[in-house]
Amino acid sequence: MAFTDYETEQLRKALLKETRHCAVTLGMKKTSVDQLTKAVGIAKGSFYKFYESKEMLFFAVLENIHSELYGVADHALSEADSLPPPERTAKAVLAVCRRLSDTGDMVFIENDAKLLLQRLPEDVKNVHYHDDETHIRQLLEKYDLVPNRGVSLAAATVRGLILTVSHKEQIGELYPQVLETLVYGACRELFK
């Protein structure tokens, strides 16, 4: 059955939405193409008109998550343009952490992203995938923010702070205050 352009776009969105849900709740390994196609109401054979493989679909989800997170950081930096660099960057990091906490996407990133990237063809990674440091560097340059000990340390620190999202339960009810303390302290150190 041929799909109209509109149907194709709607089905692509539905596949992405369902895959993101499964990425967080089941994980990539436990999610099957059969399960995804049943959820969106298409035949298994039709799946391959949308994506070459399950991994390519999960990669599209990972790219969407990254784009959303960098959009959140970009918006926070733009909104806080009157603040000094430490507070401005802290607001961006906190916004990203809150987004990850609210969506549950950190489960997918921590549990499946590394395996997913290992399974992708090199040409796909070379064309489409950019590491966090590249994106963080672009945001810092866009807003003329210069960390005093280098972008590599700033990017590694941001990754470390973001990893606290996955330990929210262990930290307990004081997690929001702990996160703010860590983020503001790190940003003051990086941008003093």
Range-by-range predicted roles:
Residues E9-K17, K30, F50-D74:
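An amphipathic alpha-helix adjacent to DNA-recognition modules
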Residues C22-M56, A60:
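Helix-turn-helix
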Residues D74-A76, I109-R119:
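Short linear capping/connector segments at secondary-structure termini
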Residues A60, D74-D102:
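Hydrophobic alpha-helical connector segments
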